[in-house]
Design a protein with these regions (language model features):
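Extracytoplasmic
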Residues: 1-175
Length: 175
């Protein structure tokens, strides 16, 4: 097998079986008042808080219509889900402002030596036409973490003022 170079890849976030899955690490960062978000080795956001700007993402809409928005987060080392966190998501004419992350569900230890992922449904958005859509996600308020286990220090030196976003899912709502 011989591959031609340069290799051509497609990094667009496309629909698969009615779901558009948009990894946080596929986005770019818009700096905030006190710095900017970075990405951790697992592709999650790092140091994402109200002062570090917003995450800019894109996806391809094949089927215009209404989509449910799910936001996936991962636990921050030995801290549990941050109760009371609020986010804002903007796309086109849709603004889901100051939405509470409620932990609608949890995927337990999906990767070896990892922490559980949680998801929160934050609302619905409508895309009236096909094509590339831009999405902006920002953190309005960080909730309160409770500790898990017995470690007193944060292994990566991050503050508790931080939410780890993994991905956004847009789920097409059939009529």
């Amino acid at each position: 097998l011989v591959c031609e170079t340069p290799i051509k890849t497609d990094t667009r976030n496309l629909m698969n079986e009615g779901i558009i899955s948009i990894p946080a690490a596929s986005g770019t960062v818009k700096a905030g008042q006190k710095g900017k978000i970075t990405f951790a080795e697992g592709g999650t956001t790092e140091n994402f808080n109200p002062q570090t700007g917003s995450l800019l993402l894109e996806c391809e809409i094949d089927i215009p219509g209404e989509y449910e928005v799910k936001l996936y987060t991962s636990r921050h080392w030995r801290k549990s889900f941050a109760e009371g966190t609020f986010v804002t998501l903007k796309t086109g004419d849709n603004i889901l402002s100051n939405r509470l992350l409620k932990k609608d569900g949890e995927l337990a230890n999906v990767r070896q030596n990892s922490y559980p992922e949680t998801w929160s449904t934050i609302g619905t958005v409508t895309f009236p036409k096909e094509g590339t859509q831009k999405i902006e996600l920002s953190i309005d308020k960080i909730g309160t973490f409770t500790r898990l286990g017995h470690f007193g220090e944060d292994l990566q030196g991050e503050s508790e003022n931080n939410i780890r976003i993994m991905k956004i899912e847009l789920i097409y709502k059939t009529q």
